[in-house]
C-alpha cells in the first residue's frame, strides 16, 4: 500500500468519510479528515465503535476528549505510515502522554519505550501517575523500582506491589553497549546511565556495581566512575599500563576496589570516592612496591586470574595457577594453595585456560576452586585440600548450602554436585550440539529459583541462551540470530546474550540495595 498517497488524501480531504475533532484539557482543538476503514483496521477503539450499533458508529463527525490532541493526532497519522512528532515535549514526557493516549484508544501502551529514559526525582510522580492509570505487570513493576527515589514515601504503595518489587528486582545483568550502561533480567531491560561521551571503551575492560552509592566502576587503562542517580561521571588519569584484564573486585567497605595489574604482578587498591590509588603490593609475597620504580615482569599468568573476598570481608584470595590468601588490611599472605593437578595426575584434555571459576561456600568454610584439571574443595581458613572431583568445568554457582551446579565442557551440560558427600547427584546434558565458550557463566537467581547460563552457543554459529528450572530440571531454549552487536536480543525478552568477545558485563544481585532494605523494613513494620 502507498501510505504516502493515502496520507495525502487525508491532507486533501479526498475520499474521507469521517471528520474527527480532538480536544484536550489545554483546549487544543484539531480537526482531522480520515478514513473509517484505516481507523478500524489499526485501532481497537474505532474497531469497536464502527462494528457495533453505537450511536456514533454511523456519524460523519465525531468529537473525542483526549489526554493530548497533538499526540493523539501523531498516533492516528502513524496508521497512515507517518512518524512525525508534533510537540516539543521532552522525550520522557512525550512518551508518558503517548501511553495515556494509547490507553484511551484501547491500544497496547508502549510501556517498554520508557526503559530508554532515566527518570529523576522531579518526574518520577509523572511516571507513577501514568502507570497507575493503566495497570501493572512485572516489567512495569521493574521499571517503577528502577526509577524510584530512595527517599520516596512508600505509604503510597500497596503492600502487594512492594512485595512484587522485591521479587522482580533481585537479579540483573549489567552491560555496556552503544555509549550507555543498561541492565536486564527476565522481566525487563532499562538504561541506567545514558549519553556517555569522551569515553574510550576497551574490550578488555570490566565493570563493578557499587550498591550503596549507586555507581558503576569501569576499570581498564583508566578508571571511570558513573553515578546512576546524578548521571555524572568522573575519571582518573591513566594509572594501569596493562594490555589485558584487571579482574577488579569491590571491597566490603564499598569505597575501594582491588584489582590485579598483570604488567607488574601487582595487587592494586583504589579509592572510588577520592579517585586515588591507595597502594600496590607484589602479588607473589604481599610486599608493598612503588609502581613508578618497578621494571620487572609479571610472575603469574593472568589468564583466568580472579580476586574474591571472603564472606566476612577480612580476607581475599587471588587465584591464578594457585591460590594466595591475603589479609585485607595489611595485604600480607595468610596461606597458599599451589596444587592444581589431581591425585590421578590425569590431564582431562584441552580447556582454553587453566583457571575457570572460584567462590566461597555458603557456610563460609570452603573455597571452590574450578580448574581444567577438576574441582578442588579447599579449607578457607588454612588452604588445605578437603576433596577434589575430576571435571572439565567452566563456571560454578550455589544451588543450596550443600549442592553446587557446574557448567561443563564434557557433554556440554550441567552437573549437580554434593560436595559434603563428594558425589554427583544429577546431570543435565544438552542435546542441541551446544559448545559452551570460555566466557560462559552459570548463575542462580535465588529470587525465582531459576538457573541462568549466560553466553552459550553452538557449533553451527547459531546462538542459544538457557533458563533452567531447578525444580524439575527442564530447560527453556531461547533462539537468537547472530547480530553485529555486543549482545543478542531474544524475541521473548527472557534474557539477552552477551557476546563472548565482550566481557564488559556484570551480574548484579544488590541493585538499589538501600531501597530494597527500606521496602523490607516498611513491609515488616506493617505486618
UniProtKB/Swiss-Prot annotation:
Name of the molecule in the record: Putative BTB/POZ domain-containing protein R225
PROSITE patterns assigned to the protein according to its UniProt record, in alphabetical order: BTB (PS50097)
Residue ranges annotated for the BTB domain, each copy included: 16-89
Lineage: Viruses, Varidnaviria, Bamfordvirae, Nucleocytoviricota, Megaviricetes
Homology family: Belongs to the mimivirus BTB/WD family.
Originating organism: Acanthamoeba polyphaga mimivirus (APMV)
InterPro entries hit by this protein: BTB/POZ_dom (IPR000210), SKP1/BTB/POZ_sf (IPR011333)
Amino acid at each position: 500500500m502507498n501510505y504516502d498517497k493515502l496520507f495525502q488524501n487525508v491532507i486533501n480531504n479526498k475520499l474521507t468519510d469521517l471528520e474527527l475533532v480532538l480536544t484536550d484539557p489545554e483546549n487544543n482543538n484539531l480537526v482531522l479528515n480520515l478514513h473509517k476503514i484505516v481507523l478500524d483496521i489499526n485501532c481497537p477503539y474505532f474497531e469497536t465503535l464502527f462494528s457495533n450499533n453505537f450511536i456514533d458508529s454511523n456519524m460523519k463527525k465525531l468529537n473525542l476528549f483526549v489526554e493530548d490532541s497533538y499526540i493523539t493526532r501523531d498516533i492516528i497519522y502513524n496508521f497512515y505510515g507517518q512518524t512525525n512528532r508534533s510537540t516539543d515535549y521532552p522525550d520522557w514526557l512525550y512518551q508518558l502522554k503517548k501511553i495515556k493516549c494509547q490507553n484511551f484508544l484501547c491500544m497496547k501502551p508502549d510501556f517498554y519505550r520508557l526503559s530508554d529514559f532515566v527518570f529523576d526525582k522531579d518526574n518520577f510522580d509523572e511516571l507513577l501517575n501514568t502507570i497507575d492509570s493503566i495497570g501493572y505487570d512485572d516489567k512495569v513493576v521493574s521499571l517503577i523500582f528502577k526509577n524510584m527515589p530512595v527517599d520516596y514515601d512508600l505509604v503510597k504503595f500497596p503492600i502487594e506491589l512492594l512485595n512484587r518489587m522485591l521479587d522482580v528486582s533481585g537479579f540483573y545483568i549489567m552491560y555496556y553497549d552503544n555509549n550507555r550502561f543498561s541492565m536486564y533480567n527476565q522481566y525487563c531491560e532499562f538504561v541506567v546511565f545514558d549519553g556517555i561521551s569522551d569515553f574510550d571503551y576497551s574490550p578488555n575492560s570490566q565493570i563493578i556495581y557499587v550498591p550503596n552509592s549507586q555507581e558503576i566502576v569501569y576499570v581498564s587503562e583508566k578508571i571511570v566512575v558513573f553515578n546512576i542517580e546524578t548521571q555524572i561521571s568522573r575519571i582518573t588519569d591513566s594509572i594501569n599500563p596493562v594490555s589485558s584484564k584487571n579482574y577488579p573486585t569491590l571491597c566490603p567497605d564499598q569505597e575501594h576496589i582491588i584489582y590485579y595489574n598483570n604488567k607488574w604482578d601487582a595487587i592494586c587498591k583504589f579509592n572510588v570516592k577520592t579517585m586515588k590509588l591507595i597502594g600496590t603490593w607484589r602479588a607473589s609475597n604481599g610486599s608493598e612496591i612503588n609502581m613508578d620504580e618497578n621494571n620487572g615482569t609479571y610472575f603469574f599468568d593472568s589468564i583466568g586470574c580472579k580476586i574474591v573476598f571472603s564472606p566476612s570481608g577480612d580476607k581475599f584470595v587471588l587465584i591464578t595457577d594457585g591460590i594466595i590468601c591475603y589479609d585485607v588490611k595489611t595485604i600480607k599472605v595468610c596461606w597458599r594453595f599451589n596444587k592444581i593437578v589431581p591425585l590421578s595426575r590425569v590431564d582431562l584434555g584441552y580447556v582454553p585456560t587453566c583457571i575457570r571459576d572460584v567462590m566461597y561456600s555458603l557456610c563460609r568454610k570452603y573455597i571452590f576452586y574450578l580448574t581444567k584439571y577438576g574441582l578442588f574443595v579447599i579449607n578457607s581458613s588454612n588452604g588445605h585440600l578437603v576433596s577434589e572431583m575430576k571435571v572439565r568445568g567452566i563456571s560454578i554457582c550455589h544451588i543450596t548450602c550443600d549442592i553446587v551446579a557446574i557448567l561443563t565442557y564434557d557433554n556440554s551440560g550441567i552437573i549437580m554436585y554434593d560436595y559434603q558427600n563428594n558425589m554427583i547427584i544429577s546431570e543435565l546434558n544438552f542435546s542441541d550440539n551446544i559448545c559452551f565458550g570460555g566466557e560462559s557463566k552459570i548463575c542462580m537467581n535465588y529470587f525465582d529459583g531459576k538457573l541462568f547460563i549466560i553466553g552459550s552457543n553452538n557449533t553451527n554459529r547459531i546462538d542459544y541462551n538457557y533458563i533452567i528450572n531447578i525444580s524439575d530440571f527442564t530447560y527453556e531454549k531461547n533462539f537468537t540470530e547472530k547480530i553485529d552487536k555486543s549482545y543478542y536480543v531474544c524475541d521473548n525478552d527472557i534474557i539477552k546474550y552477551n557476546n563472548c568477545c565482550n566481557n564488559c558485563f556484570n551480574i548484579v544481585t544488590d541493585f538499589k540495595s538501600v531501597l530494597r532494605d527500606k521496602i523490607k523494613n516498611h513491609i515488616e513494620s506493617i505486618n
